[in-house]
């Protein structure tokens, strides 16, 4: 899907973000879309967890492990790292794929409206740190306009079950944290003025059973409209 600017014939890039709680099934859904959409004009961006895992202390412990063990000590550092890595990969993808549609697993707006805000509200990111974070956000994210959001809606308990089942290194997440994430996602997305497609993902199904979600997704982003 691509669009030409009528005045200057400059290709316009569309960005759609797949959102949801930790363990909601975002990564699985994005992989499924990548395998089944079959459109050369659509590019996919996974959450840069692999980049986060390269940030380690001298003992080899990752920032992700440190953050989940001690939110207050590493909240600001982790959120800055998450923001910078997400911004970097999206910027690179946009420059390399002019005029294409980008499907990203989360976006910089998620960091601001869910994770950074939640940590600030709970006192784990200090006032001065939060002001610095917002300065960074306002300065560098203005050109990363998201055109629509796909919300993978899953209850916190189901997310917790999936997190425990996948057992990623360093990912020990209390149910209370997931419940808070759920509330902040709901508050942000349900009050956003951006187009929103909500897909329920409460049940564990095989990937081939996501075909109904694929059809809803295709309709949502108008892949069949020639522009």
Model-flagged regions — what are they?
Residues 26:
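Conserved lysine of the Walker
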Residues 3, 160-227:
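NTP-dependent small-molecule kinase module
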Residues 74-144:
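Glycine-rich phosphate-binding loop used to anchor ATP phosphates in small-molecule kinases
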Residues 29, 33:
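Hydrophobic positions on the alpha1 helix immediately C-terminal to the Walker A/P-loop
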Residues 18:
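Hydrophobic anchor at the beta1->P-loop junction of P-loop NTPases
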Residues 21:
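P-loop (Walker A) phosphate-binding loop of NTP-binding proteins
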């Amino acid at each position: 899907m691509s669009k030409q600017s009528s005045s200057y014939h400059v290709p316009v890039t569309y960005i759609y973000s797949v959102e949801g709680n930790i363990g909601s099934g975002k990564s699985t859904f994005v992989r499924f879309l990548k395998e089944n959409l079959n459109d050369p004009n659509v590019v996919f961006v996974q959450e840069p967890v692999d980049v986060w895992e390269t940030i380690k202390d001298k003992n080899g412990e990752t920032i992700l492990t440190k953050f989940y063990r001690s939110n207050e000590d590493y909240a600001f550092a982790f959120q800055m790292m998450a923001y910078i890595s997400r911004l970097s990969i999206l910027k690179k993808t946009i420059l390399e794929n002019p005029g294409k549609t980008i499907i990203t697993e989360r976006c910089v707006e998620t960091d601001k409206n869910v994770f950074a805000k939640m940590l600030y509200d709970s006192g784990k990111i200090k006032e001065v740190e939060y002001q610095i974070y917002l300065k960074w956000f306002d300065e560098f994210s203005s050109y990363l306009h998201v055109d629509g959001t796909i919300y993978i809606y899953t209850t916190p308990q189901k997310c917790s079950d999936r997190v425990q089942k996948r057992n990623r290194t360093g990912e020990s997440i209390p149910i209370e944290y997931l419940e808070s994430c759920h509330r902040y996602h709901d508050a942000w997305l349900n009050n956003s003025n951006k187009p929103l497609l909500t897909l329920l993902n409460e049940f564990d199904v095989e990937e081939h059973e996501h075909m109904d979600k694929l059809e809803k997704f295709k309709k949502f982003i108008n892949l069949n409209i020639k522009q």
